[in-house]
């Protein structure tokens, strides 16, 4: 068991380093530059009256942004997460926590979040579990993860490509739909489904809508590509390493994933992430129908520096979003839905 924990910690440290490498970004597939908003030369509004309030899990929120789940369970994570949570406490951004998988077998692992929760009790946090762990974990244990964190909801991460390439990957997803449906019916917290950079098809989204998930974070191609990251880690495994290269462009991009969801007129909220680098990208997702937008890599880069850098990044993104709204004549986020170029 100790070897498993050491392996887990090393993998999480590897992920931090590799996620920042340009080669592991699918930016050449990023669709945002091919989608435009309609410019308004005479916006009949005052910039200071622009509101970026949104609805998240049926509640009004001041900021429509979430820091996507990134890291936990290793020695460097505490400082990174402290800076992220400190910034969230000042800006009212939400935050997804890193993997809580280890907490299922190591009771001490939960204490990683205890001091952060104590210092920043008002930050809206979201629990994190992978779909492979969901299959054979009792719902009572999952609820305990959420309650210990005092989380708003649970984000279940789907990452089939990553698991195929990862040297330690878990590739038994059999029973995932049955487990997910049972979770949604029985757990006391909202359930959000999130991809990890490969997006969602219309058929999968339809099934998710039918079982009643609260939200789907589409997380499409265009940003950090976990298949590429695991390919770097599998450099001593020629089969996995070559497979990673074969699938380096695999997935459905973020904008198409949002369109797939919108076309269903779903009961779940649509969240957008995957290659979102600035406030203009976020504005385009809101224009398509997203209600929450997630950022990962830009926040990780800032958090490796300081809380101040995270705050600067957040404030810049908010200002960029408001600039996009001003230049399209949009006073509230819903107005952006009329400003997408046909």
From Swiss-Prot:
The keyword Isomerase applies. Its cofactor is FMN; NADPH; Mg(2+). Homooctamer. Dimer of tetramers. This is Isopentenyl-diphosphate delta-isomerase. Keywords: Cytoplasm, Flavoprotein, FMN, Isomerase, Isoprene biosynthesis, Magnesium, Metal-binding, NADP. The keyword NADP applies. One of its GO terms (cellular component) is cytoplasm. Signal peptide: none annotated. It comes from Legionella pneumophila (strain Corby). Pfam families: FMN_dh (PF01070). Substrate binds at residues 11-12, 99-101, 162.
